[in-house]
């Protein structure tokens, strides 16, 4: 969904890679997806700099393993199993210096992918995001919606790896 949206907004997009260097391979794309972002993947100060809407006038640098890279993105989509508040909290930030409100005001929308629904959420305070009732749709991407029961049978995997007892001559 994030990639579809980014492509509709601006053609080519960059999807982050390894947690050791999330901007590895970035080549100036104007749409960036920070996919499955975790609190330890990027320092909070760098995330604030990347998402600063007023930083477009001056060069924003993304942290990268060997040398930082200039970012020319006008769209940044973040996917994460963490809510924005959980992400902030898990980083162990000093709320007096870099408070959560700095991140919250940079977010145009917080969309939660639930098993059955996709919800636009609103920050309700005290770390809670609540779905907005008029902005909820069925989630066609979930296993539930697709009827995908791709659960794995451990015994089947075991037999596949080791072979049947008749094949044990290897």
Give the residues covered by each predicted segment:
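Glycine-rich phosphate-binding P-loop
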Residues: 1-8
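Short, flexible loop segments at the rims of nucleotide/cofactor-binding pockets, characterized by
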Residues: 9-13, 54-56
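Short basic/glycine-enriched coil/helix segment immediately N-terminal to the Walker B
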Residues: 25-29
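Short beta-strand-centered segment that lines the nucleotide-binding/catalytic pocket of NTP-utilizing
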Residues: 11-23
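The feature encodes the CheY-like receiver
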Residues: 40
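Walker B catalytic acidic pair
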Residues: 36-37
């Amino acid at each position: 969904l994030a990639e579809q949206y980014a492509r509709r907004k601006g053609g080519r997009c960059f999807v982050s890679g390894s947690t050791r260097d999330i901007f590895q391979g970035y080549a100036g794309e104007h749409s960036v997806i920070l996919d499955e972002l975790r609190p330890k993947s990027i320092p909070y100060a760098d995330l604030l700099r990347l998402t600063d809407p007023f930083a477009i006038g001056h060069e924003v640098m993304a942290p990268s393993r060997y040398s930082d890279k200039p970012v020319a993105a006008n769209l940044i989509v973040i996917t994460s199993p963490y809510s924005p508040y959980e992400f902030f909290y898990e980083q162990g930030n000093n709320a007096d210096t870099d408070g959560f409100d700095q991140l919250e005001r940079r977010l145009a929308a917080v969309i939660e992918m639930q098993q059955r629904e996709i919800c636009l959420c609103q920050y309700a305070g005290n770390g809670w995001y609540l779905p907005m009732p008029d902005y909820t749709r069925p989630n066609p991407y979930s296993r539930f919606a697709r009827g995908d029961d791709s659960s794995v049978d451990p015994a089947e995997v075991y037999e596949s790896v080791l072979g049947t007892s008749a094949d044990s001559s290897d």
